[in-house]
Amino acid sequence: MPPAAALSISFTRTAPEDWPASWQKLRARVKRGRLCWTYWELGQDLCRGADPERLRVLAQIVTSLHRPAGTNTFWPCTLAALTDGEQGRTAFRRDLFWSGVRELGVRMVVSMGDQASIAIGLPKEAVQPLHWDIRNGVILCTVWDFVRIAEQPSRLDDVVVFLNNMFRLLRL
């Protein structure tokens, strides 16, 4: 495997005090954790109420992993703007995603779905489920999005097995 430096994703590290107000407000609510989950709709789920089906699937995965309390954190790659002129518009902010990952003390990111993985900086051709790499000094795992898991429920078990194997391999 190439050294981690060769697999960096370009972003400008932004200090939390320079983040837009909506990102600062969310950061104040998010707890630190070694394992960070992200998906395209996460910002919406955190700020406007979680989609029940996504919440059910995510809870099932997290519970099945049997990680100690305080392991998981959730940090979005997208967040809807909160200013009147931008109401409802969702944009991805790679710089704020990776700055947040650093701020939260994350060692491993689980990116659910192609859209989120591309938003955080993976080249489209590198995005595939049940794959891992080292990017920006953290382990980045890509898995299916919620729609793909719902299409084939056995994928949920595949995600759990893959992540548990990663934990063992990396001693996390």
Segment roles from a protein language model:
Residues M1-L172:
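A polyanion-binding, active-site-adjacent surface
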